C-alpha cells in the first residue's frame, strides 16, 4: 500500500483552490478539481470536510465512471473508500467539488496499491466563469424534472458541477476552466439570494475572492489573479438581481448604476487578463427579458470587439426550475458552436 499526500507533484489542481497549506489544499468553488493517474486495484481518499449546510458530497471520476460519495457532515478528517477490485492498470482520476457553498473540503491524501502519476491532459484554451446556481450546476441531476420546478426539499442532493454547462463546455472544447459561480449570486450586495435574507452578498464582493463565503471558517480571502489568465471569460449574472425589488431594473437611474458596476468589474478583469474575449449571457432558466436588454445595452456601450452578448435559443424560457443535465448540455452545445464560429475560427 502507498499513501500519497496532497503536496505530491503528480496532483494538478484546477479552480480557485487555496494552496497556502500544501499538505491540505482547500477546494472552494463548485467544479474545482484535482487530476492525476494511478496504478492500482483500489482507491481511498482522506479529506477534511468543512460543512456549511446540512448535506455535502464530492465525486471522483475513474476512467470515465463517476462515483458520488456523501461526506460526514462534521468537521474533521475522514477516509473514503471510493473503489475496490479495479483492474491492476493505470487509471485516470478526477476528484472534484460537486457543490458550491454547502461546504469546502481539504484534500489530505490518496491511498492505493500502486504508483501515482501525473495527468496527461493538456489544454490549449482557458475558460473562466462568473455566474449563479445554473453555472454552478445546482439540481442538474434531477432528471425527469426538465421544464419543471425543482423537487421539494432537495437539499443539494442533486447538485453536480460536472453536469453544468460550464464544465460540459470545457470538456467539449478540451479547455481548462475556473468556475467562480455561486447559487443565488447577483451583481450587487443586498440583492439576490446568496447569504440571505439579512446579509445578501453579490458578485461585487465575491469576484476577487479565493474564499468567497462570508460565513465560512476561512472568512473572505483575496484571490491572486496572477495565478490564472483565461482566454475567454463567460459572465452569467443577472438572473437573481430582481430580488428584493423586481421593478428596480426598469428605473433608468438604478439601471445605470447596475450597468456601471457590471462594466466596472468586466473592465477590471479585461485589464488584469490583458484583453481576453468576454461572452455575456443569462441562461435558459426563466427570467424577465429586461435583464437581457440591459446586458445588450452594456455590450453596446462597451463597443468592443472583445465583448460578445449571446442569447440561447430558449433563453429565459426553457424551465422554471434549475436546468437539468439535458438542458445544461443544450446550453453547452450552443456555446461551443458560438465560440468555434466566432472566437476560435
Per-region residue spans from a language model:
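N-terminal secretory targeting modules
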Residues: 1-161, 345
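Alpha-helical scaffolding within the catalytic cores
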Residues: 14, 214-225, 263-268, 293-298
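Structural recognition of the beta-strand scaffold that forms the well-ordered cores
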Residues: 126-130, 135, 177-180, 231-236, ...
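Conserved SGNH/GDSL esterase-like catalytic core that processes O-acyl groups on lipids
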Residues: 151-251, 286-289, 326
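A structural motif corresponding to the C-terminal end of an alpha-helix
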Residues: 162-176, 265-277, 299-305
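Solvent-exposed, polar/charged alpha-helical surfaces in well-ordered, non-transmembrane soluble domains
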Residues: 167, 171, 260-267, 293, ...
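Active-site segments of SGNH/GDSL-like serine hydrolases
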Residues: 234-243, 262-297
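Extracellular serine-dependent O-acyl
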Residues: 277-345
Amino acid at each position: 500500500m502507498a499513501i500519497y499526500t496532497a503536496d505530491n507533484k503528480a496532483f494538478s489542481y484546477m479552480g480557485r483552490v487555496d494552496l497556502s497549506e500544501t499538505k491540505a489544499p482547500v477546494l472552494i468553488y463548485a467544479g474545482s478539481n484535482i487530476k492525476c493517474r494511478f496504478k492500482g486495484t483500489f482507491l481511498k481518499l482522506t479529506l477534511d470536510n468543512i460543512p456549511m449546510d446540512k448535506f455535502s458530497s464530492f465525486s471522483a471520476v475513474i476512467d470515465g465512471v463517476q462515483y458520488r460519495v456523501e461526506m460526514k457532515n462534521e468537521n474533521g478528517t475522514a477516509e473514503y473508500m471510493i473503489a475496490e477490485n479495479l483492474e491492476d492498470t493505470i487509471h485516470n482520476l478526477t476528484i472534484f467539488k460537486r457543490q458550491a457553498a454547502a461546504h469546502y473540503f481539504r484534500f489530505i491524501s490518496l491511498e492505493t496499491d500502486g504508483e501515482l502519476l501525473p495527468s496527461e491532459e493538456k489544454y490549449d484554451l482557458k475558460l473562466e466563469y462568473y455566474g449563479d446556481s445554473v453555472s454552478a450546476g445546482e439540481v442538474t441531476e434531477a432528471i425527469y424534472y426538465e421544464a419543471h420546478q425543482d423537487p421539494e426539499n432537495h437539499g443539494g442532493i442533486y447538485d453536480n458541477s460536472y453536469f453544468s454547462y460550464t464544465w460540459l463546455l470545457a470538456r467539449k472544447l478540451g479547455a481548462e476552466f475556473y468556475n467562480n459561480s455561486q447559487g443565488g449570486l447577483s451583481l450587487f450586495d443586498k440583492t439576490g439570494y446568496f447569504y440571505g435574507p439579512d446579509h445578501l452578498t453579490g458578485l461585487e464582493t465575491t469576484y476577487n475572492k479565493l474564499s468567497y463565503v462570508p460565513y465560512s471558517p476561512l472568512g473572505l480571502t483575496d484571490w491572486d489573479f496572477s495565478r490564472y489568465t483565461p482566454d475567454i471569460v463567460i459572465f452569467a449574472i443577472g438572473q437573481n438581481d430582481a430580488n428584493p425589488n423586481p421593478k428596480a431594473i426598469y428605473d433608468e437611474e438604478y439601471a445605470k448604476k447596475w450597468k456601471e458596476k457590471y462594466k466596472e468589474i468586466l473592465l477590471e478583469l479585461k485589464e488584469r487578463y490583458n484583453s481576453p474575449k468576454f461572452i455575456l449571457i443569462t441562461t435558459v432558466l426563466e427570467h424577465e427579458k429586461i435583464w437581457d436588454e440591459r446586458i445588450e445595452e452594456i455590450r453596446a456601450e462597451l463597443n468592443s470587439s472583445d465583448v460578445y452578448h449571446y442569447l440561447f435559443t430558449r433563453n429565459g424560457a426553457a424551465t422554471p426550475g434549475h436546468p437539468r443535465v439535458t438542458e445544461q448540455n443544450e446550453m453547452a452545445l450552443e456555446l461551443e458552436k458560438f465560440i468555434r464560429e466566432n472566437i476560435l475560427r
